[in-house]
Amino acid sequence: GLFDCHRNRVPVLAIASHIPQSEVGLNYFQETHPENLFKECSCFCELVSNPKQMPEILFRAMNAAIGNQDVAVIVLPGDVAVMEMEIDELPVWNQPRLPHIVPQRDDIEEMAAHLETGKRITLFCGAGCEGAHDEVVELAKRLQAPVVHAFRGKEWVEWDNPYDVGMTGLLGYTSGYRAIEQCDTLVMLGTDFPYRPFYPENAKVIQVDRDPS
């Protein structure tokens, strides 16, 4: 579950239980090291060894989960969880607002030039198109381009979209596969589709994504 959320950029706050601190390293029943286990699937993972740490660590974990759209894990040993503590003042938490990312003008102009010369353009939409359904349909209308969606883009672009031709990928349809196979310009919007054999062999591929990696 947490690995899926990490991969799909879903903000999650997870509190993972741990054995009593006095038993760590002594081959205790079902002993693991949660702070190591969860590092691979989180952007924040900290161990609470004193109850006084909890308010500030909780504050930072929530900021990390929402700000990074990722998983934040707090590891809480059983003995620490039952300790009493006095709280003088709680951190003031305001929900962070995600930044609005704007592409470079030069990149937009270069993309527009490719779209002007493309004869068979296909739009390939993923989860990054959330909230942009109308814009995707309008772009498809202007380009007269079919819209193919990835599995996670289905709920954002398929409905009420006369240009949608279905999904591609391991669970996709022939129509979606053919629309990509036969295009000369593929515009990937909000997807990092990993299945290389489904990409066109001789087309220009333009990727619009918030993550440049």
Model regions and ranges:
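N-terminal alpha/beta PP-like core and its mobile active-site loop of ThDP/TPP-dependent enzymes
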Residues: G1-S213
